[in-house]
Amino acid sequence: SHNPAKYNGYKAYGPDGCQLGLEAADYVLSIMNKVDIFDDVKTTDFENAVKEGKIEYIGDDIINEYLDCVMACRVAPNTDVGALKVIYTPLHGSGNKPVRKILSKIGVTNVTVVPEQEKPNGNFPTAPYPNPEIRQAFECALKLAKDIKPDLLLATDPDCDRVGIAIPDKDEYKLFSGNDVGALLLDFVLSRRKANGTLPKDPIAVKTIVSTELCRKIADNYGCKLIDVLTGFKFIGEQITELEKKGEENRYVFGFEESYGYLGGTYVRDKDAVIASMLICEMVAFYKAEGKSLIDVLDGLYKKYGYYLCSQKSFTCEGESGMNKIKGIMTELRTNPPTEINGHKVVKRDDYDTSVSYDTVNGVENKITLPKSNVLCYYMEDGSSLIVRPSGTEPKIKMYLGSVGKTMESSEKELSLLADVGTKLLGF
């Protein structure tokens, strides 16, 4: 995925193309646990497996059908994208062919691929941490940009489900966060589909609980219902599947998570950097034709809805003592929940492990209908928020911070203070 070369693993998907949900994953794991990995594993050679139909090659017909599905999700098909100049890096991964193919199909032909990162290489020699969320992954592309001076830099992670972007900002290049791009894409998709007359009745967008609340304001403006789900794109995929069961999948317009995952269609049930790259190119070209950059557009959203800013901090707690420390932090927060954070009264706290949302102002408890998860959320009277959860894959406890202000300066100050207060609250 987007981890260093030393990491190993796999993702398990169901017949609907969505990662296995909690119940299905537990069932599969129970079957796996019954298998003796030394005696019960059946083996065969590759060619025999192909002959027996146990392994199937994905043909061009499937690939072309996939590309057609992505193309059908364009929201500004009349936008002239031909003049767009793009630098792209697949970060030694699988994105090179599909991303370049889809960009070519919509007319983006001036694409320069970072040469030293073009071919797949699981050792990731030029990007030890091939994650488009961090600036280091863009270093080769940024060097190339000094000569080419593109309108847009795109970087997809090795399995091509996340995409990061950078655009010119005076003499430098500004990298956008996943929340920035998620808000921009949601507004772009909703505004263009409304203008095109293709916005469905009672549209639905989906985001994870740790993603920016700016999207709620944007969705409300277009009469779009915004659904919150637990962290992990499989929960966004599950929402599409539930809509499909009711014959209402056309209501889904967009889904995203702050960790650079986006999906603008229902043809798959996971984040997809191919469609995201297409929509981003459309968006940059559309606003360029209006004389705007994404910096201008994002600032316009802030001025209209409020300066919603987000950040996160992780604290590493290794070994058994670290696990106990994380457990102790979560227990203490549940036993003695804060009533005030950063000088602002906590008006609501959500505990996804007990499935209880508590309105501290009115003293009312409401049931959380999402699956149980070890997550605690605190919402303050000024609109700021603090969310705490242990990492599911690393020996870390994570803290997600959100602030909102009438100016960038006031929101940035609030976010910085909130980070300090949150760090002390967790005991670090």
Regions found by a protein language model. Name each.
Residues 1-36, 131-155, 160, 183-189, ...:
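Phosphate/diphosphate-binding loops
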Residues 3, 90-96, 160-162, 210-213, ...:
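Gly/Ser/Thr-rich loops at beta-strand to alpha-helix junctions
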Residues 6-13, 99, 161-180, 215-218:
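Short Gly/Thr/Asp-enriched flexible loops that form oxyanion-binding sites at enzyme active sites
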Residues 8-145:
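Gly/Ser/Thr-enriched, mixed-charge loops and adjacent short helices
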Residues 20-21, 167-193:
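Cysteine protease catalytic core and zymogen-processing segment of caspase-like enzymes
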Residues 24, 95, 178-185, 211-215, ...:
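Catalytic-loop motifs flanking and including active-site residues across diverse enzymes
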Residues 146, 150-152, 156, 172, ...:
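Phosphate-binding and adjacent anionic-ligand microenvironments
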